[in-house]
Amino acid sequence: MKDRYILAFETSCDETSVAVLKNDDELLSNVIASQIESHKRFGGVVPEVASRHHVEVITACIEEALAEAGITEEDVTAVAVTYGPGLVGALLVGLSAAKAFAWAHGLPLIPVNHMAGHLMAAQSVEPLEFPLLALLVSGGHTELVYVSEAGDYKIVGETRDDAVGEAYDKVGRVMGLTYPAGREIDDLAHQGQDIYDFPRAMIKEDNLEFSFSGLKSAFINLHHNAEQKGESLSTEDLCASFQAAVMDILMAKTKKALEKYPVKTLVVAGGVAANKGLRERLAAEITDVKVIIPPLRLCGDNAGMIAYASVSEWNKENFAGWDLNAKPSLAFDTME
């Protein structure tokens, strides 16, 4: 059988990435051009800046991905691309490049949900057994997803307000930490003690919903009041207390979901899945099911995860037309 090579594009936010996947599971290349340095001074992602950077580097990323994979344009079998959710301008750059490449070479175009990409990055660790449950935690999303089979996703719980990664970045900004603040807060948390009593919203309620806005507000108020009084708070203890509250919420809801949906596998994915505190809590407390977390290089936004997610769409021949457009608010229940 002839080998299949999928060229995948990811430009949903501030990472320009192009990857090549051979057959179902051999990731030959995963080129990522990060924009973090450009956005640091703004304390967050500026959509217009992100779009311009994507335009500047995407052609070079395509060339590098093909070269690193050791293949030519003529070897590519199909093109996969993130079409949502994300920043509309950023998404359009990747879509335009992917459609142009596919059209020029007469190749099928595979539409991929960005969050499905995070989830299916776990396929890089080992073949996934369905049904499974997934906890998706990133800068823009916090979701519990039931996956009956590859490509069939159902959100069973999600945040009512802030995503967990968003809460980390806002708290980091208050403390004057460099954007993105997640890794630094995680590191500082491991040096401090959980001494501040922050709220754990809805932790005892019998649902699978999350809420982080109250925790974020409590943190900001404590920090602001201390500043007003001229008091000094331990940054390490603040981070430890904040992270402990976040992890208590995530673990409580995940355990409830596992009780409701008796599966054998839990996938934890998204940028926040790189958090050491989360990985430690999962290892210590989730012992009845197999926990699969993608490697660190596949936790953040990258085209490799889009390539993995595209395999099930390829198998279903779920190809898009040239009118495929960006869907910045795309959810699992509104996929093409």
Curated annotation (Swiss-Prot):
GO cellular component: cytoplasm
Cited Pfam families: TsaD (PF00814)
Compartmental location: Cytoplasm
Protein origin, superkingdom: Bacteria
Annotated substrate binding sites: L136, V137, S138, G139, G140, D169, G182, D186, N275
UniProt keyword annotations, A-Z: Acyltransferase, Cytoplasm, Iron, Metal-binding, Transferase, tRNA processing
Top-level EC class: transferase
Cofactor binding note from Swiss-Prot or TrEMBL: Binds 1 Fe(2+) ion per subunit.
Biological processes, Gene Ontology terms: tRNA threonylcarbamoyladenosine modification
Needed co-factor(s): Fe(2+)
Main location: cytoplasm
Catalytic function, reaction form: L-threonylcarbamoyladenylate + adenosine(37) in tRNA = N(6)-L-threonylcarbamoyladenosine(37) in tRNA + AMP + H(+)
An MF annotation (GO) of this entry: N(6)-L-threonylcarbamoyladenine synthase activity
Binding site for Fe cation: H114, H118, D301
InterPro entries: ATPase_NBD (IPR043129), Gcp-like_dom (IPR000905), KAE1/TsaD (IPR017861), Peptidase_M22_CS (IPR017860), TsaD (IPR022450)
EC number in record: 2.3.1.234
Family of the protein in this entry: Belongs to the KAE1 / TsaD family.
Functional description taken from the UniProt entry: Required for the formation of a threonylcarbamoyl group on adenosine at position 37 (t(6)A37) in tRNAs that read codons beginning with adenine. Is involved in the transfer of the threonylcarbamoyl moiety of threonylcarbamoyl-AMP (TC-AMP) to the N6 group of A37, together with TsaE and TsaB. TsaD likely plays a direct catalytic role in this reaction.
Protein name: tRNA N6-adenosine threonylcarbamoyltransferase
